[in-house]
Amino acid sequence: MNFSVITCPNGGTNQGLLPYLMALDQYQLEEFKLCLEPQQLMDFWSAPQGHFPRIPWANLRAADPLNLSFLLDEHFPKGQAWKVVLGIFQTMNLTSLCEKVRAEMKENVQTQELQDPTQEDLEMLEAAAGNMQTQGCQDPNQEELDELEEETGNVQAQGCQDPNQEEPEMLEEADHRRKYRENMKAELLETWDNISWPKDHVYIRNTSKDEHEELQRLLDPNRTRAQAQTIVLVGRAGVGKTTLAMQAMLHWANGVLFQQRFSYVFYLSCHKIRYMKETTFAELISLDWPDFDAPIEEFMSQPEKLLFIIDGFEEIIISESRSESLDDGSPCTDWYQELPVTKILHSLLKKELVPLATLLITIKTWFVRDLKASLVNPCFVQITGFTGDDLRVYFMRHFDDSSEVEKILQQLRKNETLFHSCSAPMVCWTVCSCLKQPKVRYYDLQSITQTTTSLYAYFFSNLFSTAEVDLADDSWPGQWRALCSLAIEGLWSMNFTFNKEDTEIEGLEVPFIDSLYEFNILQKINDCGGCTTFTHLSFQEFFAAMSFVLEEPREFPPHSTKPQEMKMLLQHVLLDKEAYWTPVVLFFFGLLNKNIARELEDTLHCKISPRVMEELLKWGEELGKAESASLQFHILRLFHCLHESQEEDFTKKMLGRIFEVDLNILEDEELQASSFCLKHCKRLNKLRLSVSSHILERDLEILETSKFDSRMHAWNSICSTLVTNENLHELDLSNSKLHASSVKGLCLALKNPRCKVQKLTCKSVTPEWVLQDLIIALQGNSKLTHLNFSSNKLGMTVPLILKALRHSACNLKYLCLEKCNLSAASCQDLALFLTSIQHVTRLCLGFNRLQDDGIKLLCAALTHPKCALERLELWFCQLAAPACKHLSDALLQNRSLTHLNLSKNSLRDEGVKFLCEALGRPDGNLQSLNLSGCSFTREGCGELANALSHNHNVKILDLGENDLQDDGVKLLCEALKPHRALHTLGLAKCNLTTACCQHLFSVLSSSKSLVNLNLLGNELDTDGVKMLCKALKKSTCRLQKLG
């Protein structure tokens, strides 16, 4: 088993200071934190300043009383922490709290005299460490020494004695505590013995040396002295969360772990207690106590020495979801108050009942979000289950031949979904049980492990093909329907535990249930009398999916809800993107495979309905009637589902109305699913394909040649879509990580004469040399009209790109090189490009340091008679007034340019004045001008107003984010009154007030062309808005959009 820490804030065991810290109000707490600075501590402590550790102020500032107590524990020895708190309280004149702290300090003196750490203490510590080494123990690390100080203030070594030797505390412990340990150990072993583990699974509960060390780290994941008080074990079903928690309990009961930290460990099974009625917390923790009364008062007197293990908390969340929430927000602190169990558990989680106790919680991944709100400073530990090495060990227990094991593992890695599922031991057992059957010799390994559904189907078929079950032949279909109904109803209600009444209601017969127990499909729950669960969640999910494909006595009768439920499931997964139902839907599609259906019918004596596929196709047609069906649902999930079916004809029909696909390929399973489905999207016209991982790169991690070859085969299949699909005209490869082999396949497809791609976008593609190969492949391509290479560091690649695009057969109309690290020198190549061809009409060069010198070169091209450029984007190119002079001169001669974007350049009033020399000509061709964020004022606005009064060809003008003020807009409005062309005006964030609204009112009332006006980010008060609204009501106002 393996686990990893996700996150853990500072937290730990505190020594009783928390109640006093919680008594401080907000302002007192802040003052207390300030007093913890070393310089402040010198005022009431005799030690020099350097004697005190400095607590990082960032930690102090954010700390609440609970975290503050942890910080004190972490940075001060026990005795010193108490004296520091007392000294600060005295400084703050908190007399009452001082008296209480002194009283408790006197009580503590009976067991240990509170004093400063002295040289004698340090010598004793070193001596003890030396004694441990002479006894054959490892040298303790700093964390262990810190724990010694924390536990006793003297010298005791935790975790360094022989694991089989009890600590001194164990030898002297009270009789009732010893009996409790023995009772817990006996119950744990009995529980494990009663679990119907599959063959060879018992070894999983044994603990190796490494796992023993992992258990030691479990309750201190960050290896800090201030240990976390709430640890949450998170993981998928069956990866070992409960097993790990039970191992921790068993080690404590055996006296080899957590001895000094915990006097008592309590196990609360949510399976069991969810059915309990109202009780008290004292009664709840006494359930598993031996024959005599539990020492509740002792528990209450040492709360920091208690560990509560809450196993399977999702059961409580599910129970709450079926009824009104019992957590009404009122705190629960009384151990003897009778309350619903869920209320008690929430109070325990919120640190209301036992604030100083440590909690260890296990929960399935899906439900973590519902748990977080109830926790105080939790630490989440991801339980990952079997590692690759664990899998190899497990498979070697089933297959003696190591070469056969490697062959199986190699094949499993091709199916990433199945391989990842094998982190759960029960799934491993399923795989091994299936592959060991004699029947497998008639099926190659690849077909059995091709999909997760195929493996499970063969597994269950093998179990029942020779099973002797005392059941009439005509009873089998009904029994399978009953089992599948139990599975799906449980998932609808998020129920994974079933009592006897549940199985009786579904009509499951005893012989059939016994066979399910025998084959480890179902399992009895020991701590919940008469309760049953599926041995692994994937079994329940498989049979839940099977409930939708089984033929009913009268197939889809009028009262049947199966078709509606099926569509609801698809809605959950494909539209709402809910992960909870994804495995069920995948199994559902997998069961549509004709070969799998035939196998199940022959061995399970059931009938698969042929109408299910018809219903699914109808649903697909309804969804596809939308204008852009692929935008409504998660297309990659649909691809996963169709790949699971492995039904080519069905897939082709389902994807017949898909016109646009957006794929982000991270894993091998996504690559394989895309390869399977894309070739069937015959009406696809736009493909966005992002390979955002190094999955196509052959490195040391991909040792198996067959796996790499499988990936490249899938990739080349995707590339072939560019050739075989005559409707595919747009390809977007942005944010892709490619490499030599993958680029080769892509280039071959783009060079193919049958490729119909017209628009190619390659933003942020790595590595940059990929673009060189692509542009070489595109050289002479007469179909390509749009090319976007923005957000790439082209550098020296620019001349090569432009040279290729100057090919006589090239028909490019749009070129975007925004944010490509271009410089003024690059403009020389761009100028040559613009004068060499006459079909490029739009050039986007924004976010490049072209500067004034670069624009001068470009403007020389704009005046060339062969330049046909219509749109030029030069936003944020570090231009100034000189650039405007060059542009103005060019505009006076150029007869094609109609759109110019100069936004985010510091042109200022001088630059605008230069532009207006060309803009003011009545025969000017410019129709759209963007000068937003160009740092000019009302003076520049006046120049624009004068120019517009002579030129009525400008239709779009954006002047936003300039300091125009009301006076500037007044001049502009006077020019716009007779203007007959302007339909869009941008004045966002221009420091306008209500004073300008009268002028805007006049324009809105008279203009017959203005339909869009942007005034966002200006301080227009109610009167100004009312004036604008008055204009909108006039019949002469043509405005359609006001921002």
Swiss-Prot record:
LRR repeat windows: 725-749, 781-804, 837-864, 894-917, 923-946, 951-978, 1007-1030
MF terms (GO), sorted A to Z: ATP binding
Keyword Nucleotide-binding: yes
One of the record's GO cellular component terms: cytoplasm
Segments forming domain NACHT: 229-558
The organism's place on the tree of life at top rank: Eukaryota
InterPro entries: DAPIN, DEATH-like_dom_sf, Leu-rich_rpt, LRR_dom_sf, NACHT_NTPase, NLRP_HD2, NLRP_innate_immun_reg, NOD1/2_WH
SMART domains named in the record: LRR_RI (SM00368), PYRIN (SM01289)
Keyword flag ATP-binding: yes
Function: Involved in inflammation.
PANTHER family: NACHT, LRR AND PYD DOMAINS-CONTAINING PROTEIN 12, NACHT, LRR AND PYD DOMAINS-CONTAINING PROTEIN 13
Protein name: NACHT, LRR and PYD domains-containing protein 13
Name of the gene encoding the protein in the UniProt record: NLRP13
